């Protein structure tokens, strides 16, 4: 791959910027991070970059593209900078379609519900037990989908796996890590969820968290000691 100018990443920490940081690390892509405090995301300078006023966003000088929404950024990075399909699949293939399916499920099924569960448990100004119960049920439902699917996937001859798609770790798996790990630090067993009830998911997360690229991408959430 020819020389690549550093990609600018706006925002760090929280559940969504690490999804992008993990992909950048896994693909060894040069980048620089500009911190955007949550108190600044609705100010004109940042809204000019992301009109939705959320993090992350990127600017890629190699293609002169500004892009926001972490799922769209993940898709963009692997389509442009993973020609050897280290963590992706050939464009137009069934495996590529399946990987996109899991990415969309993460965006629609994991992110909103896990975020609401975390909000009502940790940040809402008053306790609303019915809201916590509703969203924790969704965490269990979504994690149950992952558990069932992983339990049916084959393990490679070298012992690697199981993975969501194609017998290898791909962006389809990696996109799930931040929220799936963060929620275990906020939602406690007494709230009705523990990853220990999902052994295939726990093993899957442990294997991903052992990857250097994942450790680097998650460092803002869980710094090494």
Swiss-Prot record:
UniProt GO cellular component terms: cytoplasm
Protein's name according to its UniProt entry: Glutathione S-transferase-like protein tpcF
Enzyme category, top tier: transferase
Residue ranges occupied by any GST C-terminal domain in the UniProt entry: 92-225
EC number: 2.5.1.-
Domain GST N-terminal: 4-85
Species name: Aspergillus fumigatus (strain ATCC MYA-4609 / CBS 101355 / FGSC A1100 / Af293) (Neosartorya fumigata)
MF terms in GO: glutathione peroxidase activity; glutathione transferase activity
Function: Glutathione S-transferase-like protein; part of the gene cluster that mediates the biosynthesis of trypacidin, a mycotoxin with antiprotozoal activity and that plays a role in the infection process. The pathway begins with the synthesis of atrochrysone thioester by the polyketide synthase (PKS) tpcC. The atrochrysone carboxyl ACP thioesterase tpcB then breaks the thioester bond and releases the atrochrysone carboxylic acid from tpcC. The decarboxylase tpcK converts atrochrysone carboxylic acid to atrochrysone which is further reduced into emodin anthrone.
Entry comment describing in which tissues the protein is expressed: Specifically expressed in conidia.
One matching Pfam family: GST_N_2
Keywords in alphabetical order: Transferase
Gene3D superfamilies xref list: 1.20.1050.10, Glutaredoxin
Family per similarity comment: Belongs to the GST superfamily.
InterPro entries: Glutathione-S-Trfase_C-like, Glutathione-S-Trfase_C_sf, Glutathione_S-Trfase, Glutathione_S-Trfase_N, GST_C, Thioredoxin-like_sf
Pathway assigned in UniProt: Secondary metabolite biosynthesis
